[in-house]
Amino acid sequence: MSPFILTLAERGLYPDAIVRWGIRQLLKQRLAEIRSGDVETAAQRELRFIDEMSRAPIAVLAEKANEQHYEVTADFFGHVLGPHLKYSSAFWSAGAATLAQAEAAGLHETCLHAALNDGQNILELGCGWGSLTLWMAEHYPGSRITAVSNSHSQRAYIEAQVRERGLEHRIRVVTCDMNRFEIDPGQFDRVLSVEMFEHMRNWPELFARIRRWLTPEGRFFLHVFVHRAASYLFEDRGPADWMSREFFTGGMMPSDELALACQDHLACVARWRWDGTHYEDRKSTRLNSSHIPLSRMP
């Protein structure tokens, strides 16, 4: 795909149907790479990925993630997200007819699967615009929540919401790169992370730190998007790698089994899966609300 074609797409000069067609062509290229070779080749490729991951920093190019995602203003996201500003996948349950309902269903499911109870001390890693943190504070009024983000604008937005809702004594927001984040050990009943680990690289080391932060009976809840079979990095290898260059620099697509290969410090006790169509429906809903004036674009 030529730079000229991508430039026209960035300027919004193609109808949505053409943009979707282009995305499908790029996806076909990626799938062809993943499916190359026999089952042994695929297994060895995954083992190499795990080995390289375990020797990397916890996160790479964290400043790029901020530039591309997290220092974009809340005003912009207010036009393209639902009322909770949930930056991660929504859950289109049978009763969810609107994005607001699907966001709420996703937040409810997360708390249910994380086995939250009122009165717990909770740490959220990668809190985004505070959708889960504020939801937990509302539904578990006896709990204390520490929310971590690498974005100053996200912290400012969440703290404004905290003041508006009178939650100053229950929510603490920390701005820190995950490479440097540390906190007193043994204090959290629950650690939650929703769609942050795709921006991380060394999962085993971060799992080890999370284990230190948990109480002896504490649990960690991890939500990531995955490919069913293969892990891969988003690397800028040429003009067609728009996603890697402009939106997800330093990110990864984990495989469905990747976390199970990182159990030296934490053991998996339960797993759930949301079908990828929940993400597809969310993206379609965002698209329908994303035709906003250029003056609002970041």
How should these model regions be labeled?
Residues 30-113:
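Conserved Class I S-adenosyl-L-methionine-dependent methyltransferase catalytic core
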Residues 118-128:
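Conserved class I S-adenosyl-L-methionine
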Residues 129-141:
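Conserved SAM-binding loop of SAM-dependent methyltransferases across substrates and taxa
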Residues 165-180:
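Conserved SAM-binding strand-loop segment of SAM-dependent methyltransferases
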Residues 179-191:
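A short acidic, Gly/Pro-enriched loop at the edge of an enzyme's catalytic core
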Residues 204-219:
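A short glycine-rich, Lys/Arg-flanked "PGG" loop and its adjoining helix->strand segment in the class I
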Residues 226-228, 232-284:
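Substrate-binding/catalytic lobe of Class I Rossmann-like enzymes that use SAM or dcSAM, i.e.
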Residues 283-291, 298:
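Conserved small/polar residues in nucleotide/adenosyl-binding loops
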